[in-house]
Structures are given as structure tokens and as C-alpha cells.
């Protein structure tokens, strides 16, 4: 006897699973301009690398003890490769109950499912392709009881954040648990216009708050990405979102016990760009393009910006020097003169923590007059957020290298280096430093003296000029209070040499990052 009948049933069940929620719902998904979950997995992974797990799970119909039909579970997951490296991948099937969770004995994925277990045990990155509404209130009719939300299994999501890279793409309307899972990632991206993110959707908002809003008004990318910063990046299409995930992972090790991957670079480490000698205006009040400096210093076309539309007075992203991954943190003088507010501080702190976890050295490009000031900045908690970012930076164990391009003042300037470990600081001739800018600082420190004269404006100018005469960066270098003054054109060669030299130390940092106490 053979098992031919059972093998035929297996093939039948597989074919039904491949049809997802049926032709009509698949066509509707396509009409909305969105891919199905199986198409998404195929698009984000290397060709023919996907091995599905749990394909037969679903809500089956039986008649007289014989299998009749099955509605697939609204989640597809398995093992695949991105750029030849293994990843765990999974996502909601919106064509089956809108991607809401299924009442299975064991979760396939989502919060605390098999796919998360696979990422943890195999120590491989986790890729979440998210489009779903989370819990389905109708499930109580079948179960005959209401369960506690603590069973949603976010514990595994939390564990993964300390072990392997986690990337998430929000690809359609997403609420509840899937929305929380999108945020519990190291990198997230959402499709503008097609995807929305919220804790609860419009029907719940209307019932609870008596407000009518559309999904886009509630949680479109203009909210989730640009204003709230809940999601890191926006994308114009699903294809672009997948490309961003692939690119993000290209800088990451597979887990915290590995170093980031080195790629072969044809960009000479000795490349010196003439434009760097003139890019900073002699007028210290005029802004310039920091992103242009980034493009000239780091390996060509290697900069991958993270959160470009949130916290716009700062710039964060991944790049390479001589093929080695580095994290770039820069001030943006085109926005608020580069002064970080609470949003910028949260952005920089999160990014530094990411780099520290995955053993990626940090390069700071500094032009900061201090933290953003004024009533609005104080009301949004800029000081506390700034100190939180400083706390993260001070406990980071990765090497850091600081290039002071122009201003470096106050606590925001101090955020860019540490005194308890090696921190190589090099300044351009355009650099200026201090605990507080001369403008405003003199008026505060010499208030009585200035007001007691018959010509306060003239005395203010005299004191400012006297202090400014001591502000040459060469005086600071004479005291070895800054390690080097360099020709701006030497920035890339210097950084390349130090990043390469740091690789031996990086090998001593592998493993999870210990907790550093309670953040401010």
C-alpha cells in the first residue's frame, strides 16, 4: 500500500492555500494597488529562496469525517534569503478576514508566533510585511470567552529587538497589534497613500471620541512618518519599500554575535574632494548643505538616510567608509541652524542605540549652536529628550569619531563625544566651540557690567569682540583640547584609516548590549 490518497489531499490543501482568500478578494487587493502577501514575500526575497512554514494552517470544513474545504490562516511566513543571507519573513494576508488574527492553537506569526521563534533560535533577521487590523472581536463568538490582551505575545518581539535586526514594512491599513509590531522594529517603512497606521481605526475613534476621520487623516504617512516619527521612512511604492528593507539589512550583521558585513569598495580611501574646502561659508550665519558633505566624504552612493522627514534639524543614516558600515549623525544647518529639539533628540538617540547594538561605529558631523530653545521647545520636552540621547551616547561602546565642521556649543555639542572612552575629534578651520554661543552668552554673563555703562550696546560689542579673539580653533588645538585641526579635504582619508583600525576593537564588543539603567 502507498500513501497516494493522503499525498493528493496534501497537494489539494496546498493549492487552496495558494489561492489565499479567493480570486475575488485577490482582484480587489490588486484594484487597490496593493500586492498580496505571497507576492510581497516573493518581491522582498531573493528569487526562489522562500520555504514556507505552516501552509496548511487554517479553518477547515469537514463533512462526514472527510475534508471538504479550508480557509487559509490570514498569515503567511517562512524562511528565505536577502542578498544570500537567511531571514525569517512573514505577513498578514489581507484577503482573509482583513488580515485579522486567527484562532489557531499556535500562532504562525504576528506577536509571539512561530516565525519570531525561528528568527530568535536561528539568529537571523526578522522581516515583517504588515497589513492587518489585529484582533477580531468576532473571534469571541467562536471561542465563547474573551481573552486577556496579555496573551498577545509582545515578549518575543521585545526579545528580538536585542538579538537580531528587525525590519517592518507597513503596506496597507494597519491597526492594533500589527501596528504595535511595526513600531517594535529597528527600521520601518510605509507606503505613502496606500498604508495607514493607528492604534484603533476610524470606527473605534468615532464611537469613543465622537469624531469622524478617514484612515488617511488618522494615520497616513504624513502623520506616522513626518509628524509622529512612529515609522522611520516613507516609500512611493511597495517595490521601493522592499528595496529600503533590503538596503537597511545590507549594513546589518545577522545578529549581535556577528560584525556588520564588509563590502568591496572601489572608492579610494585617499579621495580628497576640492569642494569641501569651500562648502562652509565664511559668513557664520549662512547655512550650507550638510548632505552634500556626507556625499563627498563617505563611499559614493553609500548613504542610506533614516527618518529624513522627522526631526529635520538632524540627519541620521547608514553609510560606508572603505566598505565598512558606519552610522552617520549630523546637524542640518538648513533647519533651525542645526539646533535639535525633542524630535531630533529622540531620532539621534534611537539611531545611536541601533548602531551600538549592531557594532556599527559612529561618525558625528557637528554644526550645532546648542539645543533648540524657546517656549515651544521647552513645552515639547527638548531638555529631557536631549539628556536621554546623551545617556544613550555615553553608554554606547562602539568607537566614535567626531568632525567639528562649524559650531559646537553647549550640551548638544557635548552629545557628540564622550570623555570616558577614546573619542577622536577633528575640527575644520571653520570650527568654533564653547559652552554657550557668544551671542546671548555675553549678555547673560556680563549683564550688570553692560547695564552699568552709559553705552551698553558698545560695551556688549567690545566684550563679544574680546572673547571672539580667543575663539580660534588653533588656540584650542594648541592646548590639545581638540585632537586635530584638519584640511576639510582630508576628512575622508582620516576617517577611513580610523574606521579600519577600529575593527579589532569591534570584535571585542560582539554580543547583546547590557542594560544601562533608567534613561532620563
What are these regions (language model features)?
Residues 1-520:
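Ligand-binding clefts of soluble mixed alpha/beta catalytic domains
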Amino acid at each position: 500500500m502507498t500513501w497516494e490518497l493522503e499525498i493528493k489531499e496534501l497537494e489539494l490543501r496546498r493549492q487552496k492555500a495558494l489561492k489565499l482568500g479567493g480570486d475575488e478578494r485577490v482582484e480587489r487587493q490588486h484594484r487597490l494597488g496593493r500586492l498580496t502577501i505571497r507576492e510581497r514575500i516573493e518581491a522582498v526575497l531573493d528569487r526562489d529562496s522562500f520555504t514556507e512554514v505552516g501552509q496548511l494552517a487554517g479553518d477547515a470544513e469537514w463533512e462526514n469525517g472527510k475534508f471538504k474545504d479550508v480557509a487559509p490562516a490570514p498569515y503567511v511566513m517562512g524562511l528565505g534569503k536577502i542578498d544570500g543571507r537567511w531571514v525569517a519573513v512573514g505577513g498578514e494576508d489581507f484577503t482573509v478576514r482583513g488580515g485579522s488574527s486567527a484562532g489557531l492553537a499556535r500562532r504562525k506569526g504576528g506577536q509571539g508566533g512561530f516565525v519570531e521563534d525561528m528568527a530568535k533560535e536561528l539568529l537571523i533577521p526578522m522581516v515583517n510585511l504588515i497589513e492587518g487590523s489585529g484582533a477580531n472581536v468576532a473571534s469571541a463568538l467562536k471561542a465563547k470567552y474573551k481573552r486577556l490582551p496579555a496573551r498577545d505575545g509582545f515578549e518575543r518581539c521585545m526579545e528580538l529587538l536585542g538579538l537580531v535586526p528587525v525590519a517592518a514594512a507597513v503596506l496597507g491599513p494597519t491597526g492594533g497589534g500589527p501596528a504595535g509590531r511595526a513600531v517594535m522594529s529597528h527600521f520601518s517603512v510605509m507606503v505613502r497613500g496606500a498604508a495607514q497606521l493607528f492604534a484603533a481605526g476610524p470606527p473605534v475613534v468615532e464611537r469613543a471620541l465622537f469624531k469622524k476621520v478617514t484612515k488617511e487623516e488618522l494615520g497616513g504617512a504624513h502623520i506616522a512618518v513626518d509628524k509622529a516619527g512612529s515609522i522611520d521612512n516613507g516609500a512611493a511604492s511597495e517595490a521601493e519599500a522592499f528595496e529600503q528593507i533590503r538596503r537597511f539589512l545590507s549594513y546589518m550583521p545577522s545578529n549581535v554575535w556577528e560584525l556588520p558585513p564588509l563590502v568591496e569598495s572601489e572608492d579610494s580611501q585617499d579621495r580628497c574632494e576640492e569642494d569641501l574646502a569651500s562648502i562652509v561659508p565664511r559668513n557664520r550665519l549662512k547655512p550650507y548643505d550638510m548632505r552634500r558633505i556626507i556625499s563627498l566624504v563617505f563611499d559614493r552612493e553609500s548613504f542610506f538616510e533614516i527618518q529624513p522627514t522627522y526631526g529635520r534639524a538632524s540627519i541620521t543614516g547608514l553609510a560606508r567608509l572603505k566598505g565598512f558600515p558606519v552610522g552617520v549623525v549630523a546637524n542640518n544647518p538648513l533647519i533651525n541652524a542645526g539646533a535639535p529639539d525633542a524630535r531630533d533628540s529622540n531620532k539621534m538617540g534611537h539611531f545611536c542605540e541601533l548602531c551600538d547594538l549592531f557594532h556599527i561605529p559612529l561618525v558625528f558631523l557637528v554644526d550645532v549652536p546648542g539645543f533648540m530653545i524657546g517656549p515651544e521647545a521647552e513645552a515639547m520636552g527638548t531638555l529631557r529628550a536631549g539628556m536621554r540621547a546623551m545617556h544613550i551616547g555615553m553608554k554606547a561602546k562602539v568607537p566614535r569619531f567626531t568632525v567639528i565642521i562649524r559650531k559646537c556649543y553647549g550640551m548638544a555639542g557635548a552629545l557628540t563625544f564622550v570623555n570616558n572612552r577614546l573619542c577622536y575629534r577633528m575640527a575644520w578651520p571653520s570650527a568654533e566651540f564653547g559652552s554657550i554661543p557668544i551671542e546671548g552668552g555675553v549678555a547673560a554673563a556680563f549683564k550688570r557690567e553692560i547695564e552699568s555703562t552709559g553705552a551698553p550696546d558698545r560695551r556688549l560689542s567690545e566684550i563679544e569682540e574680546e572673547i571672539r579673539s580667543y575663539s580660534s580653533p588653533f588656540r584650542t588645538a594648541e592646548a590639545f583640547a581638540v585632537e586635530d585641526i584638519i584640511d576639510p579635504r582630508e576628512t575622508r582619508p582620516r576617517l577611513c584609516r580610523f574606521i579600519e583600525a577600529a575593527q579589532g576593537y569591534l570584535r571585542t564588543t560582539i554580543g547583546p548590549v547590557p542594560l544601562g539603567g533608567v534613561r532620563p
